[in-house]
């Protein structure tokens, strides 16, 4: 399967093929999460405490694309950001598992 760089497709497209490396997609998800956290008025340390995490640096790892929001934390993470958990999970799946997202929901804009 040919991989193309993310810059080669329009920003809102999720075609049927892999369009970006997983690290690039995780970074895009992290950027979105960082904006949502800022909108909620939370620091990384605040969010980590609310989620029961031992280290706030995990939030940084997720926001910088080095890790993902664990499935078991998606509901709590969404709630702490004031977002509806199912919509939050659906949005993250678009970045973390783009092919699964396309199969389940079809292509949609980010």
Locate each region found by the language model.
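A short, Lys/Arg-rich alpha-helix, primarily the initiator
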Residues: 2-39
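DNA major-groove recognition helix of helix-turn-helix
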Residues: 62-63, 73, 92
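Short basic helix-loop element that most often maps to the first helix and adjoining turn
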Residues: 30-50, 76, 108
């Amino acid at each position: 399967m040919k991989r193309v760089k993310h810059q080669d497709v329009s920003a809102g497209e999720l075609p049927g093929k892999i369009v970006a490396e997983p690290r690039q997609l995780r970074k895009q998800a992290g950027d979105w999460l960082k904006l949502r956290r800022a909108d909620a008025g939370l620091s990384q340390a605040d969010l980590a405490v609310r989620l029961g995490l031992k280290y706030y640096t995990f939030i940084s790892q997720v926001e910088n694309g080095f890790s993902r929001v664990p499935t078991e934390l998606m509901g709590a993470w969404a709630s702490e950001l004031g977002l509806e958990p199912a919509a939050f999970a659906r949005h993250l799946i678009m970045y973390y598992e783009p092919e699964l997202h396309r199969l389940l929901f079809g292509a949609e804009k980010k």
